[in-house]
Curated annotation (Swiss-Prot):
It comes from Mycolicibacterium paratuberculosis (strain ATCC BAA-968 / K-10) (Mycobacterium paratuberculosis). This is Elongation factor P. Keywords: Cytoplasm, Elongation factor, Protein biosynthesis. Its main location: cytoplasm. Belongs to the elongation factor P family.
Length: 187
């Protein structure tokens, strides 16, 4: 059990027998009336996102989630294979469980896999990754960093928006949460 004061992003709650992860939350103390906590919850299995409001201080049931450090090894058909960094056990996870994170998975990448009662729930990528641009249209003479964006394909096949001065072969830093361009990496 946890109080609303213990809420943090990533905490997994048990609501009506289902597991919900806190995506974001906000403590609100209005000038009139009691304080409350506004949350955005994501169903761990279905991916459905809902908004839920709790009165401040309410106790909620939390799930015991074991986060393990793993390394992404390879893709095997529709499964993604991860190796536990402690016992070297391999865990094949289905594409449905990996979800949108597959866009930024590179072989050898360190990834955290969350388990509940021995079953994998979801994966957590590093916040940013370095990737090489495999294709983008060439920039024009006089392009500046703030002049706009263009699509670029990175080595995993994901398409992201990058500034006009980025060329094929450049190494970029990409935010894995939303796929946004963070900067160019000096080689």
């Amino acid at each position: 059990m946890a109080s609303t004061a213990d809420f943090k992003n990533g905490l997994v709650l048990v609501i009506d027998g289902q597991l919900w992860q806190i995506v974001e939350f906000q403590h609100v103390k209005p000038g009139k009336g009691p304080a409350f906590v506004r949350t955005k919850l994501k169903n761990v299995l279905s991916g459905k996102v809902v908004d839920k409001t709790y009165n401040a201080g309410v106790k909620v049931e939390t799930a015991t989630v074991d986060r393990r450090d793993t390394t992404y090894l390879y893709r095997d058909g529709s499964d993604f294979v991860f190796m536990d960094s402690q016992d070297y056990e391999q865990h094949p996870l289905p594409e449905s469980l990996v979800g949108d994170a597959a866009r930024f998975l590179l072989e050898g990448m360190p990834v955290q896999v969350a388990f509940h009662n021995g079953s994998p729930l979801y994966i957590e990528l590093p916040v940013s990754v370095e990737m090489e641009v495999t294709h983008t249209e060439p920039g024009l003479q006089g392009d500046r960093s703030s002049a706009g964006t263009k699509p670029a394909t990175v080595e995993t096949g994901a398409e992201i928006q990058v500034p006009l001065f980025i060329n094929t072969g450049d190494k970029l830093k990409v935010d894995t949460r939303d796929g946004s361009y963070l900067g160019r990496v000096n080689a």
